[in-house]
Design a protein with these regions (language model features):
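Intracellular juxtamembrane helix-capping segments at the cytosolic ends
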Residues: 122-136, 349-363
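Glycine-rich segments within core transmembrane alpha-helices of 12-TM secondary carriers
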Residues: 139-166, 180-184, 373-389
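Central cavity-lining transmembrane alpha-helices of secondary-active solute carriers
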Residues: 57-75, 287-300
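Juxtamembrane intracellular "pre-TM" segments in multi-pass secondary transporters
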Residues: 1-14, 198-228, 261-262
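Symmetry-related core transmembrane helices of the 12-TM Major Facilitator Superfamily/SLC fold
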Residues: 171-190, 405-411, 452-471
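C-terminal ends and interior cores of transmembrane alpha-helices
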Residues: 91-105, 318-331
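Short amphipathic helix-loop junctions that connect adjacent transmembrane helices
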Residues: 33-54, 243-281
Length: 482
């Protein structure tokens, strides 16, 4: 069957579901890619001015819930209807994006982000279920390919645009996300049709309790549980793309060279995407990971299909660890961008194979249960990633933390950061007392405190996942499942 014939077989609701996914991913990643910067940025920019530890706590806990709660929210959606849950998810989303701008305390921002993640958890299982319901064995492969393409298009355009409007203020970033969610609300309200489902007499509470029984059924398989724990280590390293990379770029990387390179060929485009200072924002740069996936996923998938899923995962994670070294080990904007490409190639090789591998090792009569519980590895990975981006990152690579250490070492008198003295004020005053420009201060801290050594931690974590997967394959997994 040709691709055109396959396209004709998809019902209208299939395309509508993909459109909803596109706008939701635009809203989420437009917000999420820069969320770490929003949490730790200086207050006069409209950011929160939190510490790296506070940022890691907020992002790690909320994102963990985002991947854990769908185990429950999927059961709720099946019981009360997809359309109702979608509308509720979009209302929670929009109100959360609005709320988080209104507060300045750690506690209220934390609660607001949890609220946003609850909205995401209600949304997450529905569209993938709709794709499954509107495809058959003949159309499923291309159908899910279209779905994942929508995920990555939204994941690229959202932060790419957010990075451009960020110069006007954080409120513009949140308003763009709210606008995308509002469009989804209207599409769902007026055009989304509830799929046909078999009604069951099972009470709602019993339906919610069933997923926990399913989780227990899978986790008593100690080999599978061990595999999930190992993969959570991979996800912890991978998620530094969101938790620390934009902050590292903002603090240490010279993106002016990228801007100048683009400007020399396409000056109008450089002026459009660049900052007034002649740089590329950290959020816009980070969005290139999704762009690389859009450009190369098909080619990479064709290449790795010749390998067993576990071997492809190990190779992909190894490549990803090299990408982490290039992303966090240098100040050159072009090398960091190349590191993002290497990171993306590793992601393309390993992440899709994770799902395939779970399907391969699951008992034939429990594949759905195993696929559902596989999200526990991602949830745990987010919690670990939040911890790593907190105290470990702060002590090794947080620019403010390192500057405070130097101020103390020199015995300088710089006021403490507070409501009337921001992080920017601290950097300016410290630089003045040390007779440095801001660039000279950055270079001094880079050469004296070596924040680039954070790559050793992140790459080592990724490599440890490779080693553990190798040992798991050789000594834990039964031969028939290799």
């Amino acid at each position: 069957m040709s691709a055109l014939q396959v396209f004709k077989k998809y019902p209208r609701i299939f395309w509508l579901s993909n459109l909803i996914e596109l706008f939701e991913r635009y809203a989420w990643y437009g917000f999420y890619m820069g969320f770490g910067l929003f949490l730790v940025g200086s207050k006069e920019t409209g950011a929160m001015g939190f510490s790296s530890v506070e940022k890691g706590t907020i992002m790690g806990t909320g994102s963990m819930l985002l991947y854990f709660l769908p185990i429950l929210t999927g059961a709720i959606a099946d019981k009360i209807g997809y359309k109702k849950v979608l509308l509720m998810a979009f209302l929670i989303y929009a109100s959360g994006f609005f709320m988080i701008q209104q507060f300045s305390s750690f506690e209220m921002v934390f609660i607001s982000f949890i609220w946003i993640c609850v909205g995401g958890a209600f949304f997450k299982p529905i569209i993938s279920a709709m794709i499954s319901k509107t495809t058959n064995p003949e159309t499923a492969s291309i159908g899910f390919g279209i779905f994942y393409m929508m995920v990555n298009i939204g994941g690229f355009i959202g932060p790419f645009v957010a990075g451009i409007v960020l110069g006007k203020g954080w409120n513009f970033v949140f308003m763009l996300s709210i606008a995308a969610i509002a469009i989804n609300f209207l599409i769902t309200l007026f055009f989304f049709k509830e799929p046909e489902q078999k009604k069951t007499p099972t009470p709602l509470l019993q339906s919610i309790a069933q997923p926990f029984k399913n989780i227990f059924t899978t986790l008593i398989n100690w080999r599978y549980t061990m595999f999930l724990v190992i993969m959570s280590i991979f996800w912890a390293a991978f998620n530094q793309l969101y938790y620390t990379f934009p902050i590292f770029v903002e603090d240490w990387v010279n993106t002016a060279t990228i801007y100048q390179g683009i400007h020399s060929i396409f000056p109008s485009f450089a002026n459009l995407i660049g900052t007034p200072e002649g740089t590329i924002s950290a959020v816009t740069l980070s969005s290139m990971d999704s762009f690389f996936i859009i450009a190369f996923q098909i080619a990479v998938s064709a290449f790795v299909m010749r390998f067993k899923p576990l071997n492809a995962m190990m190779g992909g994670i190894f490549v990803l660890s090299i990408g982490l070294f290039l992303m966090f080990g240098v100040q050159s904007g072009w090398i960091v961008l190349f590191g993002l490409l290497i990171f993306g190639l590793g992601e393309m090789s390993s992440s899709p194979k994770f799902t395939e591998y779970v399907g391969n090792i699951a008992p034939a009569d429990k594949k759905a249960l195993y696929m559902g519980s596989s999200f526990l590895a991602i949830a745990l990975g987010h919690q670990i990633a939040g911890f790593l981006s907190g105290a470990p990152y702060e002590k090794v690579a947080d620019k403010l933390f390192l500057l405070k250490a130097e101020v103390l070492k020199r015995g300088l008198s710089v006021p403490e950061i507070g409501d009337n003295f921001t992080k920017t004020d601290y950097f300016n005053e410290a630089a003045r007392q040390m007779n440095f420009t801001q660039q000279q201060l950055t270079d001094f801290l880079w050469n004296g405190y070596h924040p680039q050594s954070i790559w050793i931690i992140f790459s080592s974590i990724a490599l440890s996942a490779v080693v553990l997967l190798f040992l798991y394959d050789r000594f834990i997994l039964p031969k028939k499942n290799r």
